[in-house]
Structures are given as C-alpha cells and as structure tokens.
Amino acid sequence: MGGQNGRVLLSEIAEVSRVVATTGARLAKIEALAGALREAGPFEVPIAVAYLSGELPQRQIGVGWAALRDGFTPADTPTLTLSEVDSGFSAIGAVSGKGSTAARRALVGELFGRATADEQRFLVGLLSGELRQGALEGVMTEAVARAAAVPVAEVRRAVMLRGSLGAVAAAALAGGSAALAAFGLEVGRPVISSSVLVNSRTEPPET
C-alpha cells in the first residue's frame, strides 16, 4: 500500500472493505483496518477512516441513484488514489447554480471512468449509503489504537473530546499518546458519549 508517503490506491481500500465485510471475527476486522491505516499518509488517514466506515467526509455531495444507475465503462487498471477521489467528491459537492445537475453528472462520469469495476462497486456503495462494512465505530476505534500502538482508552477519550475519529486517527498515527493527550474540552464542541465508541451496535463475539 501507500506507506508513509501516502498515495494509497482506492483499490486497496476497496479490498480491505471487502475483507472486513466478509470477516466474522472481530480481531480479524481490527487487524485488517489497522493495517490499512498504517499504510496511509497523514492526509489520507481521515479519508480512509471515513471510507472504511461507509461514510463520506463531505457527508452529502448531491449525487443520487439517478446519476449512478446507467453505469460507467470501468478502467482496466487501478490508478485512483484516496486523495484524488476525495478531491473529486469535493469538486462534485461544490457544483451549484444553473446547469449544476449536468455539471455534477459530468464530474461523476469523469471520476467513475477512472475507476475499475471493483472500485466502481465500492464507490456506488459509498455514495448510496448501502456500503455494509462491519467496521462499526467501536471496531474502528480499536483499529486506530492498534495501528498507532496506543491504549484504546486514549483514543476513546480523544474522540469524545474532538468529535471526529478521523482527526483523532491522524493525530494518533502521527504523534502517538502525546498527540492524543493534547485534545481537550473546547467551548461549543459537544462531548460524545463513550458508549458510542465502545460498541455502537451489536457486534459478533471476539474470536
């Protein structure tokens, strides 16, 4: 994968997503996710956390099923990086005004035209909200701790205070426990309940 210099390919994240979605063992999920996070560059970590959780960092970019249903001719080889996909989604979400629907579809077509068939399936799942990862927030929190070699309690505390697992993951992998300790209460920022981070839904037993 991309390593410390980043440049993680979307295909690599899509494959980790597939492994996590088809793996029943909690520890195997955690290790697969942690491995992906270790390979991501500093700016890619929050994107990887979001994608592997089945979410878009941008939340909504104005792309519905109508823009995806006709399909796109896939690329033969994977070249798209996480950063390129994230930038593409941001550009799509920024389109507004007269002719925005056509412009947005053109950008979607351009992005999907660079994706392989497997990557396209992953992107459709991501955009439609139908991506089923098995990477619940509690599992991802533990994966961040594993990847950064820090106690999971430190990650949970930081997320409670910061409110963003992606931002906390980037800090943890870059600066370890010292970076996590720097997170504190901020005026106007709500504190997340720790129970959400421990297990947001029913998990399979650890094996």
Show where each model-derived region lies.
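N-terminal nucleic-acid-engaging modules of covalent nucleotidyltransferase systems
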Residues: 1-207
